Amino acid sequence: MSEQAKLDPEPWAYHLLGLISPLLVISGNLLGVYEPIYAAMGVIFIWVVGPVLDVLLGETKVPRPPRDSGTPFEVLLWVHGILQLVVMGTFFWFAFNTGLNIWLVVGALSTGLSAAASAIVTAHELGHTRPRSPSWWLSRVLLFSVNYLHFTTEHNYNHHRWVATDKDPASATKDESLWHFWIKTIPGQFKSSVEIHNSKGKTGFNNPSYRGLALQIVTLLSLAFIPGYLGYFDGIPLTVGWIISSAISILTLEY
């Protein structure tokens, strides 16, 4: 292999393979309305097929320098973000038609696993953009779709500064178990985000972290009870499914 070939940036088109997960989940949610087993497509690909391919393909041996232009990757972030909104829309349609049963849980797992990348990881990248820009707002919508609105605040202002220290709730200790880390990091990151806003003078209900939490709770309760009260449809399955998918996406992120 020539020296020039070793220095060529990796083709950005390879990263289109990352769209397989959300596209499979969208398909599974839609087909699952007619045959529920299709709702497992995302789980099977992400937890079974993906890891097997990862082992078989192995690690790349070719050094890949950064590309001169980051535009293709910025566009790809937007594609992931838009697909996440479609994923959630199709999941709500699936939950509406399926009701409370084991297939709702399966569909929520597929949806949540996809959202861990297409929602939270994408929001993490977009969260570094200029506040109140279109990309910044998309990151807020994506975090709302998994009920984790405070994430970018804690990540950008605390984790980046104190990573791998006792001041970072998102860093695990050497001998810490996964379960203990989950129990520590999730409330710890919310508490950290509250403290960050407090330090900027945004206390009480002026604190965006508290406002975000209130918005998430009110939205979940409204979805659960208002449609049924008005006689439109039972919102409980949609709410339960949303909570499960949010939980699995958050746990996957913090894994």
Q: What are the functions of these language-model segments?
A:
Residues K61, A119-S133, Y157, L251-Y255:
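Juxtamembrane/interface segments at transmembrane-helix termini
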